Amino acid sequence: MFRVLNNDVYSPAVVQQQTTLAFGKASSLCTDNRSANDQCEMGENFRESGQDHIKRPMNAFIVWSRERRRKVALENPQMQNSEISKQLGYEWKRLTDAEKRPFFEEAQRLLAIHQDKYPGYKYRPRRKAKRPQNSLPSVSSILCNQMSVETLHPFTYRDGCAKTTYSPMESQLSRSQSMTSSLLQKEHHSSWTSLGHNRVTMATHIFADFPFYQSLEPRLSCAYFPY
C-alpha cells in the first residue's frame, strides 16, 4: 500500500496539480496581501541576472502606465506598442498634479524598498555596441566634408530682399573678377576716347587744307582716309 501511495504522489497528473495549486496560492498572495504584493513586484522588476544586473526602480510614469497600457492594449488589439506609448505619454501630460500625486507616492515607496534591498546601487546604463566603420569613405561623407570646408566662414550680402551666402574663396574670386572688369572698362574707355580724339584731329587737318578740299571732284563732298 505504501508503494501505491508513493506512485500516486509522484505521478505526472499529481505533480501538475500541485504546481498549479502552488502558483495559484502565490498569485493570490500577490493580489490580496499588500506586503506580499510589494515583494512580488520587487521580485519581478529587480531580479538579478547572471551578470548581476539590477533594474532601476519604477518612476511615477511607469507606475501609472503599467495598468493603463494593459487597458489600452485590450481596448485596441490592433494598435502597435509604439503607438500605445505615444498615447500614454500624451495622456500623462494631460493629467493634473492632483491626479499624478498617488503615482509619485507609490514611486517613492518603491524607491525606498529598492534602496533597502540594494544600498550601494548606482545606475549604470548599458553601452551601445559600436558599429564597424567602413574602410572606404562613402560619397555622402566626401560631399559633407567639402561642404563643411566651403562654408567654414561664410559671409552674407543683402541685395534688396535676396540673401546670398559666399565662402571666403568665392568672395576673393568675385572681388578679383570685379577688379579685372573695372580695369577692362577703363582701358576700353580710354581707347575709345583716344580713337575719337584722333578722328577729330584728322578732320580738322582735312578742313584746314581748304585748297586741297576745293580741288576735289564736284561729285565728292569729302575724302575718305583709312585709319
From Swiss-Prot:
Native source organism of the sequence: Moschus berezovskii (Chinese forest musk deer)
Database matches in InterPro entries: HMG_box_dom (IPR009071), HMG_box_dom_sf (IPR036910), SRY (IPR017253), SRY-related_HMG-box_TF-like (IPR050140)
Xref: SMART domains: HMG
CDD domains: HMG-box_SoxA_SoxB_SoxG
Family: Belongs to the SRY family.
DNA-binding region residue numbers: 54-122
Record keywords: Activator, Calmodulin-binding, Cytoplasm, Differentiation, DNA-binding, Nucleus, Repressor, Sexual differentiation, Transcription, Transcription regulation
Name of the protein in its database record: Sex-determining region Y protein
GO biological process: cell differentiation; male sex determination; sex differentiation
Alphabetized PANTHER family for the sequence: SEX-DETERMINING REGION Y PROTEIN (PTHR10270:SF161), SOX TRANSCRIPTION FACTOR (PTHR10270)
Alphabetized GO MF terms: calmodulin binding; DNA-binding transcription activator activity, RNA polymerase II-specific; RNA polymerase II cis-regulatory region sequence-specific DNA binding
Function comment: Transcriptional regulator that controls a genetic switch in male development. It is necessary and sufficient for initiating male sex determination by directing the development of supporting cell precursors (pre-Sertoli cells) as Sertoli rather than granulosa cells. Involved in different aspects of gene regulation including promoter activation or repression. Binds to the DNA consensus sequence 5'-[AT]AACAA[AT]-3'. SRY HMG box recognizes DNA by partial intercalation in the minor groove and promotes DNA bending. Also involved in pre-mRNA splicing.
Keyword Repressor: yes
GO CC terms in record: cytoplasm; nuclear speck; nucleus
Any one Pfam family match given in the protein's UniProt record, by short name: HMG_box
Location relative to the cell: Nucleus speckle; Cytoplasm; Nucleus
Subunit structure: Interacts with CALM, EP300, HDAC3, KPNB1, ZNF208 isoform KRAB-O, PARP1, SLC9A3R2 and WT1. The interaction with EP300 modulates its DNA-binding activity. The interaction with KPNB1 is sensitive to dissociation by Ran in the GTP-bound form. Interaction with PARP1 impaired its DNA-binding activity.
Organism domain of life: Eukaryota
The keyword Repressor appears for this protein: yes
